[in-house]
Amino acid sequence: AASAEKFMFKLSLADVLRLTMFGTLIALLKDITRIPLHIPGHSSIFWMGILVMGKGLIPGFGSGMVMGGVSGVLAVLLGLGKEGVFVFFKYFIPGLVLDLIAPLFLYKLENPVVGALCGAIISLSKMLVNLALGLLLKLPMVFLTIGLGFTSISHTLFGAAGGAIAAFLIKRLKPRL
């Protein structure tokens, strides 16, 4: 009975702890996998994939915000990015957007097309936050030198790939959860 009690956002404590694990994984993977591909958005394949997977496994409203909030706080504490404390929003906004768009797809994130669409959309939301923070803080934005069009396409492709991979993982893991 205790595990069925709602803790936050109508999610159980066990679900919030699982989401915290996913959020931690996002920040740690971003810090550990610094692959110098020099392609904008290449980390979205991991990052957006984990967000979509967490939302697919625990579909309640707020799960994206919990994962985004946890990874954002860890990103600030680990000193990820050149935005200072504002790096939090790069992690939080994709989770918020995922919470807003998942109901439009009836939470069917185990469908590879839906997973890819959600991954692409939240990856683009991260790119827009990067752009807004760069303009607001007057940071050098290398991704603008190669063009916003290419940057948008690469974010879309990597986010979609992460979302599609997450869809297959959701199908495998959901029965075990």
Model-identified regions with their sequence ranges:
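Hydrophobic transmembrane alpha-helices
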Residues: 2-57, 62
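Membrane-helix interfacial "entry" motifs
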Residues: 3-7, 11, 15, 36, ...
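Interfacial aromatic-anchored transmembrane helix boundaries in multi-pass membrane proteins
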Residues: 30-40, 71-101
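Membrane-embedded alpha-helical hairpins and interfacial helices in multi-pass inner-membrane proteins
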Residues: 108-177
